[in-house]
A protein has these predicted regions:
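"Short basic amphipathic alpha-helical interaction patches in structured regions
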Residues: 63-67, 114-118, 165-170
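Exposed beta-strand and adjacent loop surfaces of beta-rich binding modules
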Residues: 44-48, 97-99, 148
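N-terminal prosegments of processed precursors
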Residues: 1-87
Length: 187
């Protein structure tokens, strides 16, 4: 579909343990990822999530990723205490029931299942709120959202009265960015 399923969850633990706790599922109105390359070909990252058709077991989506949580696990603090880190997994909103599988890469390079849950796209528990419209200004580009890269600049530190200055600063930054490779070819 052309919508997104957003799964918010937390990773918790210490230097030697990792647990996953679900927070929420949310339907978002647009899918900004590829409609063609749904299976991650690179097998990169310390974590991977996969979406399987619940009836056939067929893999229909996968993505590898790394987390700040796993970096924190290597610190001295992680040897003395536990912490919780928020994470998000997004994937095309499923048409039918699916199984979500989150795996962690071991020291041997192999993935093992860390968390699994069934998802029914018709579930009452999936939040379906329409997001509030936000004020945004397009600086450059007009490409297909499935094949384009979106870069958002947040006006943090600018007051409402300084929005024109903010837009001019962003335009200037975009000019610098699009003057450099590889962005100069893909504007």
């Amino acid at each position: 579909t052309d919508r997104t399923m957003r799964f918010d969850f937390v990773m918790a633990g210490n230097s030697t343990t990792t647990k996953v706790f679900p927070v929420s599922f949310r339907e978002e109105p647009f899918w900004g990822g590829s409609l063609v390359n749904l299976i991650d070909p690179f097998n990169s990252g310390n974590f991977r999530y996969e979406i399987f058709d619940a009836v056939t077991g067929k893999l229909i989506y996968s993505r590898g990723f790394c987390t700040l949580y796993q970096e924190w696990q290597t610190t001295a603090e992680a040897k003395q205490m536990e912490r919780v880190f928020q994470e998000v997994a997004t994937f095309p909103f499923p048409k039918n029931k699916v199984n979500f599988v989150l795996s962690i890469r071991g020291r041997d390079g192999q993935f093992s299942r860390l968390y699994e849950t069934a998802i029914d796209p018709a579930s009452y528990f999936i939040t379906r709120e329409k997001p509030e419209a936000s004020l945004a200004t397009r600086i450059a580009g007009s490409g297909d959202p499935h094949t384009s890269l979106d870069i958002a600049f947040i006006a943090e530190g600018y007051t409402s009265a300084e929005m024109e200055k903010f837009r001019n600063d962003v335009k200037r930054m975009a000019e610098y960015l699009f003057a450099e490779a590889p962005f100069d070819k893909y504007k």
